[in-house]
Design a protein with these regions (language model features):
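A structural signal for beta-strand and strand-to-loop patches characteristic of beta-rich domains
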Residues: 1-323
Length: 323
Protein backbone atom coordinates (compact mmCIF):
# COMPACT_ATOMS: atom_id res chain seq x y z
CA UNK A 1 0.00 0.00 0.00
CA UNK A 2 1.28 3.45 -0.85
CA UNK A 3 -0.01 6.94 -1.45
CA UNK A 4 1.23 10.23 -2.78
CA UNK A 5 0.39 13.43 -4.61
CA UNK A 6 0.70 14.51 -8.20
CA UNK A 7 0.47 18.18 -9.15
CA UNK A 8 -0.90 18.83 -12.62
CA UNK A 9 0.79 21.54 -14.72
CA UNK A 10 -1.12 24.78 -15.30
CA UNK A 11 -1.29 24.15 -19.05
CA UNK A 12 -2.47 20.55 -18.72
CA UNK A 13 -4.97 19.77 -21.47
CA UNK A 14 -8.43 18.54 -20.38
CA UNK A 15 -9.23 14.94 -21.17
CA UNK A 16 -9.11 11.36 -19.91
CA UNK A 17 -5.80 10.13 -18.49
CA UNK A 18 -4.44 6.96 -16.94
CA UNK A 19 -1.94 7.01 -14.06
CA UNK A 20 0.16 3.84 -14.03
CA UNK A 21 2.49 2.58 -11.30
CA UNK A 22 5.32 0.18 -12.18
CA UNK A 23 7.57 -1.57 -9.68
CA UNK A 24 11.35 -1.04 -10.03
CA UNK A 25 10.77 1.18 -13.08
CA UNK A 26 10.42 -1.96 -15.15
CA UNK A 27 7.53 -1.43 -17.55
CA UNK A 28 7.51 -5.11 -18.44
CA UNK A 29 6.34 -6.02 -14.93
CA UNK A 30 2.82 -5.91 -13.58
CA UNK A 31 1.41 -2.49 -12.84
CA UNK A 32 -1.54 -0.81 -11.17
CA UNK A 33 -3.50 1.97 -12.83
CA UNK A 34 -6.07 4.63 -12.02
CA UNK A 35 -8.27 6.57 -14.44
CA UNK A 36 -8.33 10.36 -14.07
CA UNK A 37 -10.62 12.90 -15.75
CA UNK A 38 -9.21 16.42 -16.16
CA UNK A 39 -11.67 19.20 -16.94
CA UNK A 40 -11.70 22.94 -17.38
CA UNK A 41 -12.60 24.93 -14.28
CA UNK A 42 -15.11 27.63 -15.03
CA UNK A 43 -16.67 29.94 -12.49
CA UNK A 44 -20.44 29.94 -12.31
CA UNK A 45 -22.15 32.66 -14.27
CA UNK A 46 -25.64 32.16 -12.89
CA UNK A 47 -27.61 30.73 -9.98
CA UNK A 48 -30.77 28.64 -9.93
CA UNK A 49 -33.39 27.49 -7.46
CA UNK A 50 -36.32 25.09 -7.31
CA UNK A 51 -39.11 25.48 -4.76
CA UNK A 52 -42.28 23.55 -3.91
CA UNK A 53 -45.04 25.35 -1.96
CA UNK A 54 -44.94 24.28 1.70
CA UNK A 55 -48.47 22.92 2.01
CA UNK A 56 -49.78 19.50 3.04
CA UNK A 57 -49.95 17.10 0.11
CA UNK A 58 -51.98 13.90 0.02
CA UNK A 59 -51.78 10.96 -2.35
CA UNK A 60 -53.62 11.93 -5.52
CA UNK A 61 -52.69 15.64 -5.36
CA UNK A 62 -50.68 17.44 -8.04
CA UNK A 63 -47.32 18.96 -7.08
CA UNK A 64 -46.05 22.07 -8.87
CA UNK A 65 -42.40 23.10 -8.55
CA UNK A 66 -41.26 26.62 -9.43
CA UNK A 67 -37.86 26.97 -11.14
CA UNK A 68 -35.89 30.20 -11.47
CA UNK A 69 -32.44 31.17 -12.78
CA UNK A 70 -30.59 34.52 -12.80
CA UNK A 71 -27.13 35.70 -13.80
CA UNK A 72 -24.89 36.51 -10.86
CA UNK A 73 -24.13 39.85 -12.47
CA UNK A 74 -27.83 40.62 -12.81
CA UNK A 75 -30.53 39.68 -15.30
CA UNK A 76 -32.59 36.59 -15.94
CA UNK A 77 -31.81 33.59 -18.13
CA UNK A 78 -34.64 34.29 -20.55
CA UNK A 79 -35.12 31.40 -22.96
CA UNK A 80 -32.54 29.14 -21.32
CA UNK A 81 -33.31 25.44 -21.69
CA UNK A 82 -33.95 23.21 -18.70
CA UNK A 83 -34.85 19.59 -18.05
CA UNK A 84 -36.63 18.16 -15.03
CA UNK A 85 -36.74 14.69 -13.50
CA UNK A 86 -39.20 13.54 -10.83
CA UNK A 87 -38.53 10.66 -8.43
CA UNK A 88 -40.22 9.28 -5.34
CA UNK A 89 -39.24 6.99 -2.47
CA UNK A 90 -40.82 5.84 0.80
CA UNK A 91 -39.88 8.00 3.76
CA UNK A 92 -42.34 7.07 6.50
CA UNK A 93 -43.85 9.30 9.17
CA UNK A 94 -42.79 9.91 12.76
CA UNK A 95 -44.03 12.45 15.27
CA UNK A 96 -41.76 15.25 16.47
CA UNK A 97 -43.98 16.08 19.43
CA UNK A 98 -42.45 14.54 22.56
CA UNK A 99 -45.90 13.37 23.61
CA UNK A 100 -46.08 11.04 20.61
CA UNK A 101 -42.39 10.28 19.98
CA UNK A 102 -42.64 6.63 21.14
CA UNK A 103 -45.57 5.77 18.88
CA UNK A 104 -45.32 3.69 15.70
CA UNK A 105 -46.84 5.15 12.53
CA UNK A 106 -47.30 3.48 9.17
CA UNK A 107 -46.63 -0.01 7.80
CA UNK A 108 -43.59 -2.24 8.28
CA UNK A 109 -44.28 -4.99 5.74
CA UNK A 110 -43.36 -4.13 2.15
CA UNK A 111 -40.37 -2.73 0.28
CA UNK A 112 -39.98 0.02 -2.25
CA UNK A 113 -36.94 2.00 -3.38
CA UNK A 114 -36.37 5.23 -5.27
CA UNK A 115 -38.34 5.25 -8.52
CA UNK A 116 -38.09 7.53 -11.52
CA UNK A 117 -41.47 8.97 -12.50
CA UNK A 118 -41.25 11.55 -15.25
CA UNK A 119 -38.94 13.88 -17.20
CA UNK A 120 -39.57 16.98 -19.32
CA UNK A 121 -37.63 19.52 -21.39
CA UNK A 122 -38.63 23.16 -21.54
CA UNK A 123 -37.41 26.76 -21.73
CA UNK A 124 -37.44 29.51 -19.12
CA UNK A 125 -39.78 32.46 -19.60
CA UNK A 126 -38.69 36.05 -20.25
CA UNK A 127 -38.19 36.61 -16.51
CA UNK A 128 -36.14 33.42 -16.12
CA UNK A 129 -38.85 31.29 -14.56
CA UNK A 130 -40.26 27.85 -15.29
CA UNK A 131 -42.28 25.11 -13.65
CA UNK A 132 -42.64 21.34 -13.43
CA UNK A 133 -45.70 19.34 -12.40
CA UNK A 134 -46.18 15.81 -11.10
CA UNK A 135 -49.36 13.91 -10.24
CA UNK A 136 -49.06 11.80 -7.11
CA UNK A 137 -50.79 8.51 -6.37
CA UNK A 138 -50.46 4.76 -7.01
CA UNK A 139 -47.72 4.42 -4.41
CA UNK A 140 -46.55 0.83 -3.98
CA UNK A 141 -46.76 0.57 -0.17
CA UNK A 142 -50.24 1.36 1.11
CA UNK A 143 -50.36 3.64 4.13
CA UNK A 144 -46.76 4.83 3.64
CA UNK A 145 -45.64 8.47 3.37
CA UNK A 146 -43.51 9.15 0.28
CA UNK A 147 -40.94 11.79 -0.56
CA UNK A 148 -41.37 13.31 -4.03
CA UNK A 149 -38.32 15.09 -5.47
CA UNK A 150 -37.66 17.14 -8.60
CA UNK A 151 -34.24 17.91 -10.08
CA UNK A 152 -33.91 20.69 -12.63
CA UNK A 153 -30.87 20.99 -14.93
CA UNK A 154 -30.52 24.46 -16.46
CA UNK A 155 -28.20 25.33 -19.37
CA UNK A 156 -27.31 28.89 -20.40
CA UNK A 157 -26.31 30.21 -23.83
CA UNK A 158 -22.63 29.47 -23.10
CA UNK A 159 -23.45 25.80 -22.43
CA UNK A 160 -22.80 26.08 -18.70
CA UNK A 161 -25.11 23.74 -16.84
CA UNK A 162 -26.05 23.61 -13.17
CA UNK A 163 -28.61 21.62 -11.21
CA UNK A 164 -31.04 22.42 -8.43
CA UNK A 165 -33.59 20.31 -6.59
CA UNK A 166 -36.54 20.39 -4.20
CA UNK A 167 -38.63 17.79 -2.41
CA UNK A 168 -41.80 17.43 -0.38
CA UNK A 169 -43.66 14.76 1.56
CA UNK A 170 -46.90 13.23 0.26
CA UNK A 171 -49.11 11.69 2.93
CA UNK A 172 -51.14 8.54 2.20
CA UNK A 173 -54.37 9.68 3.91
CA UNK A 174 -55.94 12.47 5.96
CA UNK A 175 -54.63 11.00 9.21
CA UNK A 176 -52.28 8.43 10.72
CA UNK A 177 -52.77 5.88 13.47
CA UNK A 178 -50.14 6.09 16.20
CA UNK A 179 -49.68 2.79 18.06
CA UNK A 180 -47.97 2.44 21.44
CA UNK A 181 -45.70 -0.29 22.74
CA UNK A 182 -47.10 -2.95 25.08
CA UNK A 183 -48.41 -1.03 28.08
CA UNK A 184 -48.86 -3.67 30.79
CA UNK A 185 -45.70 -5.80 30.49
CA UNK A 186 -42.01 -5.01 30.84
CA UNK A 187 -39.61 -7.16 28.85
CA UNK A 188 -40.82 -10.04 26.68
CA UNK A 189 -44.45 -11.06 26.70
CA UNK A 190 -45.34 -14.70 27.37
CA UNK A 191 -47.61 -17.02 25.44
CA UNK A 192 -51.18 -16.60 26.67
CA UNK A 193 -50.66 -13.11 28.14
CA UNK A 194 -53.23 -10.44 27.36
CA UNK A 195 -51.28 -7.56 25.84
CA UNK A 196 -52.61 -4.02 26.12
CA UNK A 197 -51.84 -1.30 23.58
CA UNK A 198 -53.10 2.23 22.94
CA UNK A 199 -53.71 4.06 19.67
CA UNK A 200 -54.42 7.64 18.70
CA UNK A 201 -55.34 9.29 15.38
CA UNK A 202 -53.26 12.30 14.29
CA UNK A 203 -53.20 14.39 11.12
CA UNK A 204 -49.87 15.17 9.37
CA UNK A 205 -49.56 18.32 11.52
CA UNK A 206 -49.64 16.03 14.61
CA UNK A 207 -53.00 17.33 15.79
CA UNK A 208 -56.12 15.33 16.61
CA UNK A 209 -58.35 15.80 13.54
CA UNK A 210 -62.02 16.68 13.48
CA UNK A 211 -63.75 13.30 12.95
CA UNK A 212 -66.36 14.83 10.63
CA UNK A 213 -63.67 15.95 8.17
CA UNK A 214 -61.62 12.73 7.95
CA UNK A 215 -63.98 9.75 8.44
CA UNK A 216 -67.59 8.70 7.99
CA UNK A 217 -69.85 7.76 10.88
CA UNK A 218 -69.30 4.22 12.17
CA UNK A 219 -65.97 3.79 10.40
CA UNK A 220 -64.43 0.47 11.44
CA UNK A 221 -60.93 -0.21 12.72
CA UNK A 222 -59.55 -3.64 11.82
CA UNK A 223 -57.16 -5.21 14.34
CA UNK A 224 -55.04 -8.14 13.12
CA UNK A 225 -52.65 -10.24 15.18
CA UNK A 226 -50.30 -12.00 12.77
CA UNK A 227 -47.85 -14.74 13.74
CA UNK A 228 -44.60 -14.99 11.80
CA UNK A 229 -43.82 -18.65 11.16
CA UNK A 230 -40.83 -20.18 9.39
CA UNK A 231 -41.70 -23.47 7.76
CA UNK A 232 -38.86 -25.94 7.41
CA UNK A 233 -38.81 -27.53 3.98
CA UNK A 234 -36.49 -30.51 3.49
CA UNK A 235 -35.66 -32.41 0.33
CA UNK A 236 -33.43 -35.40 -0.30
CA UNK A 237 -30.64 -34.52 -2.70
CA UNK A 238 -29.04 -36.58 -5.45
CA UNK A 239 -26.51 -38.22 -3.10
CA UNK A 240 -29.03 -38.85 -0.33
CA UNK A 241 -28.16 -35.75 1.71
CA UNK A 242 -30.95 -33.63 3.16
CA UNK A 243 -31.27 -30.08 1.82
CA UNK A 244 -33.06 -27.68 4.15
CA UNK A 245 -34.58 -24.28 3.50
CA UNK A 246 -36.97 -22.08 5.44
CA UNK A 247 -39.99 -20.24 4.10
CA UNK A 248 -41.70 -17.45 6.00
CA UNK A 249 -45.46 -17.54 6.42
CA UNK A 250 -47.52 -14.74 7.97
CA UNK A 251 -50.45 -16.47 9.68
CA UNK A 252 -53.37 -14.36 10.90
CA UNK A 253 -54.06 -15.64 14.39
CA UNK A 254 -56.71 -13.14 15.45
CA UNK A 255 -58.82 -10.59 13.54
CA UNK A 256 -61.42 -8.26 15.05
CA UNK A 257 -63.21 -5.04 14.15
CA UNK A 258 -64.42 -2.20 16.31
CA UNK A 259 -65.57 1.38 15.83
CA UNK A 260 -62.69 3.74 15.10
CA UNK A 261 -62.37 6.36 17.82
CA UNK A 262 -60.79 9.74 17.16
CA UNK A 263 -59.86 11.71 20.24
CA UNK A 264 -57.52 10.80 23.06
CA UNK A 265 -55.61 7.53 23.43
CA UNK A 266 -57.83 4.47 23.01
CA UNK A 267 -57.08 0.99 24.45
CA UNK A 268 -56.97 -2.28 22.50
CA UNK A 269 -55.78 -5.74 23.56
CA UNK A 270 -54.66 -8.99 21.93
CA UNK A 271 -53.77 -12.46 23.27
CA UNK A 272 -51.05 -14.37 21.38
CA UNK A 273 -51.58 -18.13 21.36
CA UNK A 274 -48.04 -19.12 20.42
CA UNK A 275 -44.47 -18.10 20.95
CA UNK A 276 -42.29 -16.29 18.43
CA UNK A 277 -42.42 -13.08 16.41
CA UNK A 278 -45.71 -11.26 15.97
CA UNK A 279 -47.01 -8.38 13.88
CA UNK A 280 -49.90 -6.24 15.13
CA UNK A 281 -51.67 -4.38 12.32
CA UNK A 282 -54.29 -1.64 12.67
CA UNK A 283 -56.03 -0.56 9.46
CA UNK A 284 -58.92 1.61 8.31
CA UNK A 285 -59.71 4.17 5.58
CA UNK A 286 -60.27 7.91 5.58
CA UNK A 287 -63.22 9.76 4.08
CA UNK A 288 -61.64 9.57 0.61
CA UNK A 289 -61.17 5.81 0.79
CA UNK A 290 -57.39 6.08 1.33
CA UNK A 291 -55.74 3.34 3.36
CA UNK A 292 -54.54 4.10 6.89
CA UNK A 293 -52.23 1.34 8.14
CA UNK A 294 -49.95 1.04 11.15
CA UNK A 295 -47.94 -2.03 12.13
CA UNK A 296 -45.67 -2.91 15.03
CA UNK A 297 -43.60 -5.97 15.92
CA UNK A 298 -43.11 -7.75 19.23
CA UNK A 299 -41.82 -11.10 20.46
CA UNK A 300 -43.54 -13.68 22.66
CA UNK A 301 -41.62 -16.30 24.65
CA UNK A 302 -42.82 -19.90 25.06
CA UNK A 303 -41.67 -23.54 25.01
CA UNK A 304 -43.28 -24.24 21.64
CA UNK A 305 -40.01 -24.68 19.77
CA UNK A 306 -39.24 -28.15 18.37
CA UNK A 307 -36.13 -29.34 16.56
CA UNK A 308 -36.05 -31.87 13.76
CA UNK A 309 -33.01 -34.16 13.96
CA UNK A 310 -31.55 -34.08 10.46
CA UNK A 311 -28.77 -36.60 10.96
CA UNK A 312 -30.73 -39.36 9.24
CA UNK A 313 -32.86 -39.12 6.13
CA UNK A 314 -34.83 -42.25 7.09
CA UNK A 315 -36.10 -41.53 10.61
CA UNK A 316 -37.44 -38.75 12.79
CA UNK A 317 -36.39 -38.53 16.44
CA UNK A 318 -38.04 -36.46 19.16
CA UNK A 319 -36.72 -35.71 22.64
CA UNK A 320 -39.28 -34.65 25.24
CA UNK A 321 -38.55 -31.90 27.73
CA UNK A 322 -40.38 -33.81 30.51
CA UNK A 323 -40.23 -37.45 31.68
Amino acid sequence: TFWGQLKLPEDFEPGSYMIKYYRNNNKNNDYSSCAVQVQFFERLRFESSATIPQITYYSGDKITAEIQANYLGGGSLAGATYSTDWTREPIGFSAKNQKYKDLRFGPIIGYDGRNWLNSENNSLSADGKGSAEQKTGDEKIKGMAYSYAVQANITDAGNQRISTSARTIVHPAKFYIGLSNIKNINGFAKKGDTLNFEYICLNPEENIPNPNTVIFDKTKLKIELIHEEWKQIQQIGINGEINTRYQREMVTEEETEELLKIGNFNPISVKPKNGGAYLLRLSTTDKNGKDVITETRFYVTSSDFTWFNRESSEKIEFQTDKQ
